[in-house]
Amino acid sequence: RYTSAANIGVYLWAVVAARDLGLVSEPQARARIQATLTEVTHLKRDNGFLYQWYDTTNGNVLTNPGQGDCTETTPAFDNCFFISNVDNGWYASGLIVVRQAMPELSHLVNSLIAPMNFGLFYDARAETHCNVNPAITGNQPTGQMFGGYYVGLPPDQGDNWTHYYHNGALYSDPRISAYIGMGLHQMPGNVWWRSWRELPPPAPFADCQSTDPDFSWQGQWPMAGSWQTYTDPQSRQTFPVWEGHYTYPGSDLTFIPTYSGGMFEGLMPNEIVPETSWGTRSFGLADARTAQVQIKYATQQLHDPVWGMSPSSTPDDTGGYGGYGVEGLAFPYFGTGADASHPNQGLSQCHGCATEDVVTPHASFLA
């Protein structure tokens, strides 16, 4: 008996889709959505953003599903004070869909959107032309989005940064927050260029060679690709961008990897932003290749009768959540320092971050 910001957001646009498909009537859809939005107005929020988990029996913030309601009053690095970037991206996407589909509810929707500022998730500290800024403790990849923030515990104070991480992979589900943040002019275009399509080699400047991280541990290395320079259409600032790709072993199928091999990571934003038609040579193409990789690996390597792996609820009804994905664990992996004679040939950026033993229907449906 729990829910999350992502669940609420996806439910909102699922009801709109059900109305459009004739599965529920207009009055039924409106009543469901209005009831949900009204309930959300009573939930504890921060800057309009929802917390990680909520108890559906009383609306209280949960520590974790099955672990009871939060009782802490002093900020701590746990879910009682965590505001998730990606989950609130999905929540906001649901609000935006409802506002467009049901203008009669726009006043209620606007009251929920108004306090939200996605700039809070953006790391606006000084950038360099390298992949990271070595002048900031922890060699931080500034210009990217944080995975979230802890209420009352900002990342730039003391050693708080050790509890933070960046959503550095652009080809993952947090890019919904980048779309919304840029669309609302709450994030600069920097986030688009500074986020990584793949984990890059050191930037092509002499001063970056010793400070940029060594990503040779990633799933596939060495990686084909090249550095390109892009000019942001609004700021006119230029950015070096690594454009690489992975290749499915033994084939000419090239693709952009997700971080942990999940279908959801790559394809979910296409449900809201029509990448298939707007980005036929970029993320629309990447989405199609992701589905091809999932199908090829599941049927040929795992010999599964079904395909579609992604993080999801565990199949044991305990309320748990597990990381599942196509990581290419059946292919060679040598770890850090892999080279042309001993290449890593995995299918996801993070080797071992997920297991390949669960197929989830929502991932198959996305394709």
What are these language model-derived features?
Residues 1-367:
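Ser/Thr/Asn(+Pro)-rich, low-complexity disordered segments
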